[in-house]
From Swiss-Prot:
It is an enzyme of class 2 (transferase). The modification Phosphoserine is found at S748. The lineage of its organism: Eukaryota, Metazoa, Ecdysozoa, Arthropoda, Hexapoda. One of its GO terms (molecular function) is lyase activity. The modification N6-(pyridoxal phosphate)lysine is found at K246. Sulfurates the molybdenum cofactor. Sulfation of molybdenum is essential for xanthine dehydrogenase (XDH) and aldehyde oxidase (ADO) enzymes in which molybdenum cofactor is liganded by 1 oxygen and 1 sulfur atom in active form. This is Molybdenum cofactor sulfurase. It comes from Drosophila pseudoobscura pseudoobscura (Fruit fly). Pathway: Cofactor biosynthesis; molybdopterin biosynthesis. Keywords: Molybdenum cofactor biosynthesis, Phosphoprotein, Pyridoxal phosphate, Transferase. One of its GO terms (biological process) is molybdopterin cofactor metabolic process.
Amino acid sequence: MSSYQSEFNADEQAAIDKEFTRLANNKSIYLDHAGTTLYAESQVTAAAEQLQRDVICNPHTCRVTGDYVDQVRFKVLEFFNTKEDDYHVIFTANATAALSLVAENFDFGRQGNFHYCQENHTSVLGMRERVQARAMYMLKEEEITGMASLPSAANGVDGSSPGDNSLVTFSAQCNFSGYKIPLAAIAGIQKQGLAHGLGKRVSGEAPQTTDNNNYYVCLDAASFVATNPLDLQRYRPDYVCISFYKIFGYPTGVGALLVSRRGAEAFRKKRNFFGGGTINYAYPHAMDHQLREVFHQRYEDGTLPFLSIVGLLEGFRTLGRLVPRRSDVATMERISRHVHGLAQYLEKQLRQLKYPNGQPLIELYNRVGYEERHRQGGIVAFNVRTDAGPFVGFGEIACVAALQGILLRTGCFCNIGACQRYLGLDETMMDAIYKRAGRICGDYYDLIDGQPTGAVRVSFGYMTRRQDVDELLKMLQLSYLATKPQQRLQLIEEQAGELPKALKERAQRLRPQLLQLAIYPVKSCAAFKIKEGGGGGGAGAGRTWPLTAQGLQYDREWMIVDMNGMAVTQKRCSELCLIRPLIRDDQLVLHFGDSPAGVSLPLSLADQAENSSRCRSKVCRQPVEGLDCGDEVALWLSQHLGLEGLRLLRQSSQRSASNGVRQQQKLSLVNQAQFLLVNRSSVRSLQFEESLDETVDRFRANIIIDTGSAFEELSYKQLTIGQVQFQVEGPCQRCDMICINQRTGERSPETLTTISRLQSGKMRFGIYISRISTENNKEQQHLTCGDVVVVT
């Protein structure tokens, strides 16, 4: 194990441990300090004793309460190394409310712009709904970081010049990755503004010029100040937004907006709303009122959460007592060193976790590494991969962690911009995740077509121990490096009752599921697809499709033959893939490409037989008997495929399996087995430039599933999908048919060569399966998209 040097001596560590015995009592390991840190037990005891001892009432009634509030205001300024001559302290509900206050009251003038960092908390994006700027721009993190290197980026500015005002908002520390934007950028922005062309305009009109604009900085410091010192004598943002529960753990419901003297000048002189305590007077009979002269009093609407504010005093005292200044290193500096040391230790250990085949277990999300504390905080974000490379969903990690008492965070952490940046999500992928797939913030839909929609985050506080980090590492080692996927999923299912409600729902989706059914009514033509969200009517209903003795109802029941009675396949005519079937209203309708015109056939075999002649052909050297479907469809096929003498034949009698497959199996016009199953994880490993759906289509499978590991289906012997049992007949040996793009008919040879490389020269992809004969087979059985796949 890599070395780790503790920041705290033995006595200090013992005192800290004594304050958090509830963790051991509840068998919990807490690793989400970026969400909130934990309160010390003596802290809340002292706060409760004060409430029992003192009379603390409405500050408008009781001067003592007002004095307490003023003490807290002074402690806040002292905590950030500033004084009331330089900054005002406005108490708010939280950092989000502080950001909202800035958005509502900042005076942009006519030409002012709103700029914000992509890697920001959702609340910063919410500011866009309230700011009255001419235009809004999204900045990359490096565009803001670049302002720190300007020669003028020194101690900021004290005032402003005539002109309009632009506002730049960014986080001091990214709550997703822990990356710290250099605070020297504050002065660079204030003095130099932003160069023309920086950022992506997302709203409004581009101003004619911003040369005369004053630039102000709003610093979202909620994540940063929880474990780092913020020196407002050295760095002077115009607005600082914080939440105290992230620093002390208790109380919740109180934050603050710190406003510099310069920042106060850029606030509007008139508010859109005022509450009690913010005015000198207000007439009910006329539109006349006057705001308070004291700046912070103008914006603290209504009665302050005075009990919570008074409780902050014990938070300051507890933090200073448990992590005292030592050798001229202040409390928050020591906490910063402690959490960074833990993050650095964890990052090194995670990089060493590998599967026996050498595949790394962990994908880390970080900008600059963990060597420099001034650039990286006590946060580690990552995802887990399988031994074949695909990602494991963060919801599964959350389940595994919860069952072992490890509390961590998963998702995007209310920072969709950071998710977009670190996960490499372009605009098309964002739409696929949030609009088409329907993911919402806070859910556990963690993988969409193998692409992670979020990550796992662990973060540290002053009470986090190295042993806690080691328990996380142990969990990852035992659950992923030393346990097979099926064993892990079984364990989660067995203990799912112990999970929180949201994770119980995610645990139910850990097993592989039936994602899609593909029915190929006409052999070698396109598929009629049944998938999550709806099918196509006809025999199927929504996501469900019936089974027959031969397989999926109507699958490969028709085939096209030439004038010699020989089956026409894509090997001879690749344009067959452009014949697209639709099953509805007791009709099979065939279309060519995107043409709305088509030709219809009855689904009823009895109706077909009345007006059809019998004919014979062969499938895989086996004779088949069928019914000729008539001249109309024959002419339509010849016209669209450019081949004369084509006929459409419908199977009229059953055929049995041969060529190594069990003799009792009844077949349609398929080549070898009743069903062909393909695993999207295996398809994903091919990594073609085309969309995953296009590649899946190449393999012309009936049953499409998605599992945790690529090619694991090749080891299956039997499986159950929903209530239907299947026997694996063997792997599908591929030919050059899979080189045909099923949406265009174009050929590309790399499909075969890639499979050959991945399978050590073998052309295997997908597996043949057949339904096992049981008593249930005597009744109509169905497959439904969403059915759980259980390997037995």
